[in-house]
Amino acid sequence: MADGAGIDRKADEKIQFSTSKEVTVHPTFESMSLKESLLRGIYAYGYESPSAVQSRAIVQICKGRDTIAQAQSGTGKTATFSISMLQVIDTAVRETQALVLSPTRELATQIQSVVMALGDYMNVQCHACIGGTNVGEDIRKLDYGQHIVSGTPGRVADMIRRRHLRTRHIKMLVLDEADELLNQGFREQIYDVYRYLPPATQVVVVSATLPYDVLDMTTKFMTDPVRILVKRDELTLEGLKQYFIAVEKEDWKFDTLCDLYDTLTITQAVIFCNTRRKVDWLTDKMREANFTVSSMHGDMPQKERDSIMQDFRQGNSRVLISTDVWARGIDVQQVSLVINYDLPSNRENYIHRIGRSGRFGRKGVAINFVTSEDVRILRDIECMWLPSPCFSCG
């Protein structure tokens, strides 16, 4: 049963933590010595009691400790670092004091929304600093002064270099969905940002998956971090059924999808493809067959992506076809089905994709289309995430 903030408490209690010895559990938000105005925002947001990761991580982060926090999708990771940032900033000082870096523009914008909601009684300023938007607006907002900035690495680094994002008051750097951020593409940009920050800046790393190479890399800019880690064999999603459908040829996937579309009763669904070109192709094919779908990928202008996301969040569109730009951390509570039209080549991305379904403890279904070429990837995914094979054959 999910509470008002959408956390599945039953699943939450089953999480196994491999944590640093000094970590204590705080069963209530009141026991964390949080500001009164922040507590009001937490309760107004719908939280009644902290989730497993919140009860362990918030106090450690508020103490100023470098922290690595790992927990599965839908367990309140975003609120964990948002509450912590709101606790440590001084709203009387209109300077940037906390910085969050995310791998996608949509996730950075969502984090801004969570911060503003939780900080509703604190008069907090928080800006989403993301690529694809008006640079002049960024400059205006940053020059005015923002307590918290949530952004993508490229635009944030640019604003720092232009001296519009002032870093001298920054106390905390949060790397959200750190596995993706620290992959090859973002690594150098993160270092670009980090070298401008004060030497004493606290670093918080948050993700559903933390492969060894990511943990290894964090040693370069973290000092004696507190670790709150979920065991790898616990990284499955409660209440989510996973299936594969064997399709002999790539060409057969489309007909299979049309059959599924006709027979399944769903609230909302996300269909993942591996390339932007495939997203466009599949969208056109579905529309030609008189199916109503929307689509989104990284080549689209940011305004168009924002509009598509808003329509999907509000339930105006039921089926979204997307690349992995949508796979990480985006919460739309009514998504009950994820279809991997293409299996992800990155096995970590599989957990992020299927985590879009059954958010916050609701029941969800993930369906994977598997050709003969995909069998190796499927086995790889099985070995990575599932203690014993439990895929059902369609």
Curated annotation (Swiss-Prot):
PROSITE patterns: DEAD_ATP_HELICASE, HELICASE_ATP_BIND_1, HELICASE_CTER, Q_MOTIF. SUPFAM superfamilies: P-loop containing nucleoside triphosphate hydrolases. SMART domains: DEXDc, HELICc. Its EC number is 3.6.4.13. One of its GO terms (cellular component) is nucleolar chromatin. It catalyses: ATP + H2O = ADP + phosphate + H(+). GO terms for molecular function: ATP binding; ATP hydrolysis activity; RNA binding; RNA helicase activity. The keyword Transmembrane helix does not apply. Pfam families: DEAD (PF00270), Helicase_C (PF00271). InterPro entries: DEAD/DEAH_box_helicase_dom, Helicase_ATP-bd, Helicase_C-like, P-loop_NTPase, RNA-helicase_DEAD-box_CS, RNA_helicase_DEAD_Q_motif. A motif (DEAD box) lies at residues 176-179. Belongs to the DEAD box helicase family. DDX48/FAL1 subfamily. PANTHER family: ATP-DEPENDENT RNA HELICASE DBP3. This is ATP-dependent RNA helicase FAL1. It comes from Chaetomium globosum (strain ATCC 6205 / CBS 148.51 / DSM 1962 / NBRC 6347 / NRRL 1970).
